[in-house]
Each structure stands twice: as C-alpha cells, then as structure tokens.
From Swiss-Prot:
Biological process per Gene Ontology, one example term: proteolysis
This protein's name: Protease HtpX homolog
CDD domains xref list: M48B_HtpX_like
InterPro entries the record matches: HtpX_protease (IPR050083), Pept_M48_protease_HtpX (IPR022919), Peptidase_M48 (IPR001915)
Cofactor note: Binds 1 zinc ion per subunit.
Segments of skewed composition (Low complexity): 287-299
Region span, Disordered: 279-328
Localization per record: Cell inner membrane
Keyword set includes Zinc: yes
Gene: htpX
Major site of localization recorded for this protein: membrane
Organism, as annotated: Rhizobium rhizogenes (strain K84 / ATCC BAA-868) (Agrobacterium radiobacter)
Origin: domain of life: Bacteria
Transmembrane segments: 6-26, 28-48, 145-165, 172-192
Organism ancestry: Bacteria, Pseudomonadati, Pseudomonadota, Alphaproteobacteria, Hyphomicrobiales
Family: Belongs to the peptidase M48B family.
Amino acid sequence: MNLMRTAMLLAFMTALFMGVGYLIGGQSGMMIAFVAAAGMNFFSYWNSDRMVLSTYGAQEVDERSAPEFYGIVRDLARNAGLPMPKVYLYDNPQPNAFATGRNPQNAAVAASTGLLHALTPQEVAGVMAHELAHVQNRDTLTMTITATLAGAISMLGNFAFFFGGRRDNNNPLGAIGVLAAMIVAPLAAMLVQMAISRTREYSADRRGAEICGNPLWLASALGKIARGAAHIPNEEAEGHPATAHMFIINPLSGARMDNLFSTHPDTENRIAALHEMAQYGGGTGPSVGTPTRSGSTGPAMTANPERKSRSVPNTGRGGSQPPKGPWS
C-alpha cells in the first residue's frame, strides 16, 4: 500500500510539474518540466533522507557519544525485529523526533536535544518506538519523498512569477496561466502533505506502544511534546514547512497558516486512544531495558517522572562543562 502511495505521489508530482510548465511555456515548457520532474523523482528516492537530516543539522551518535539514547533505540529495534537504524541527534530546544530512510535497511531515527532534556527515558522509549513503527510500516519512504517534493512544488509559484511573464515563452494562456500557476502550486504543496493519511500516526502509535511495551509512556510523551511545540519555536521547521508531517508532533507554531492543513491528528485524540489501549491490555510486549556497560539489556526502566535522560550531549547552554558528543 505504501509503495502504491509513493508511486501515486511521484506521478502527481510529475503531472503537476508538466501542467505548470505548460501554463508557463506551452509544449516546450511542459517537456522541460517533465525532464526536471523525472530527475527530481530519481534524486528524491536516493537522497531525500540525507537532505532532511542535513536541513536540521542532525549528527550521528553511537554508544560512546549518547550511550543511553543509543541503547534505547538498539533495544527497541531488537524488540521490533528491525535492523539497527542509524541514530541522530539535532540541536534544537523544541522536543520532537522523526524517522527517515527509503527502507528498514537504510533507516535513520532522529531526536532533538530538547526531547532528551524534557522527557524521561521511558517517554523517550515511547517516542522512538513510534518512529521505529514508521520504519517497520515503511512510512518513511513516503514521508521523506513527500517532504522533498512538497518543498519543490511550493517553488513552482516563484518559478511562474519570474519566468511566466516573458513574451517569448509561448504561454498559451498568458497572464491567466501564470496567475493560475502561482496560486495552484503552493496549494498543491499543502495537499501533497495531506495525501499522507493521518491514520498512519494512529497506526504508528499503536505499533510503537507494542514495541516499547507500555502505551502510557508514549501517551505521556505526546502530551509533553505537544506543550513544548506550542511554546518553543523550531526555526528550521518554520523555514521548511514541507517537512512538518515527518515529526511525531507538528513542529510549526500555531500562528502559521500551514496548520489549517495539519498533517497530524489531534494530540488529545491520540493520547485517548493510547489510554484506551492500555486499559484493555494492549502493548504488553517486552519492555525496553536499560543498557548496561556490557551492552546487554538490564531490567526494564522504572517510571520516574522527575528523571531526565542521561543521553543528552552537553551543548554548553547553562553548563560549565564543554560540549560533549556530536558537538565536541
């Protein structure tokens, strides 16, 4: 189903490029747009995950630079029966996380330093289990390509503005065609994001609860992340709104028009579904354990709302120690 959805998105992207190219430059513009779309589709499949990670300045971590966080992801991947993904951290105070990659063998999960500061290890486990559920459900290819293509579509309006007014462009509809391209392209970018069904978040919540072993860990994390996202801006996401659907919670501020086309279901509804799952005994699989120095899995983490993850690399904000881990 996800492969079919991805193919449909790629076809839509190509058709949109060709349509706007025709409005701007007639048949020659349409052919140029077709070649550009084909190249972009190929590039997106192989490189869109790297582009997203680079956009947020994510840096890969391992057992030495972020031992507890890395250990949590390792144990969760084992619980899910997945290959070990690459693990990334990006320096941002807003608590959030996302997954990317074209398949489980080439997957990556990323969390913000704000997430590790704000959440307990149990809540971090719930969040990363949700992201691994996206990997297991093969949502990541669709999500990552959509982020790249939606950003490209939004640029078509500017393309129409700068090149649509030339007299030698064979535009069959004149100024009307250019105006239509300027209006339709940004709207289509939003619709592409909405093409990723909201139900994938509910599915990832349920599977994530099964992977980590406790739906309430994820429910608690969602509440904290939503409150943090509402008050702490994410400047990178604000500058690249096409990537918003990749995050566990919409990272855009509530004042943005983009939220009229939200790609996420209501957080309270997601939390309620997880509480209902816990009430009926769902998600009672193996709990993620605390990694020991030998690399084996110790006892399951005990819930302690006051405890913060020890995996947070010191970024030097408010601390006397120099930066550690990926920021050393």
